[in-house]
Regions:
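C-terminal structural segment of proteins
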Residues: 1-112
Length: 112
């Protein structure tokens, strides 16, 4: 909800972020991150981050580089099928959706 698009956020003029709270994950937590770009340092054409923490019952996927706010998916059934449905509504073309799904699959493999 904070990131509203590329280089945009929900802060109003004159507002400043005072703190960021990052909840502690359990020792069982696993994560993965994958970014698709042509060369190092380049902005992503597709990216996905995955957090799986069975002890805290957390399964979260974030898909970025979609041209708008990142797509955040939570729940036990989060995976490529759920992401594909969300990406259909993102406005990305078929190639963009396929790159995002490839990034998600690779991030999920890292988190396994």
């Amino acid at each position: 909800r904070f990131v509203t698009g590329p280089f945009r956020n929900a802060l109003e003029t004159g507002e400043v972020v005072q703190a960021v709270r990052i909840p502690r994950v359990s020792q069982d937590a696993r994560w993965g991150y994958y970014k698709v770009c042509r060369k190092p340092g380049e902005f992503a054409h597709a990216m996905a981050a995955v957090l799986i923490d069975p002890a805290r019952n957390i399964r979260r996927v974030v898909i970025g580089a979609v041209g708008s706010a990142p797509i955040v998916l939570d729940g036990a059934d989060v995976g490529p099928d759920t992401a594909a449905r969300a990406l259909m509504q993102s406005g990305l073309d078929k190639i963009g959706r396929n790159m995002q799904l490839a990034a998600l699959r690779r991030a999920m493999e890292q988190a396994a």
